[in-house]
Amino acid sequence: MKVVTVRTVVVAGAVCLGASAAAAQVVKQEVPGIRNFAKVESTVACAGAITADAVPAVKKMGYAAIINLRLATETGADIEGHTAAAKAAGIQYIHIPFSAANPDPAAVDVFLKAITTPGVAPAFIH
């Protein structure tokens, strides 16, 4: 249990430090169908919930992959619709369910592996 806790704390700390360092580089944009779009750097953008209709716009912006951290049980998550839209648009779609209320260290490991896989960057994370 201690290893899991330490790993989670280290990852959370790294994310916070990275976010702080990158804060000056964050570019926010208004994109139809995408809430709170923020380009963190040339290889990563983050946003709130998106609609399946917004997936082609993500591809058009040059992203190679969409990493969806929403739980399938969330209102409006529409994992199947997003998967189909990504396939139609020719963009990779990676669904890693993550609960902020009950974080799973295994999901963190899956995310870290996904984000470092060649061909995934630039990645759009929501």
Locate the predicted segments by residue.
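Hydrophobic helical h-region of N-terminal Sec-dependent signal peptides
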Residues: 11-15
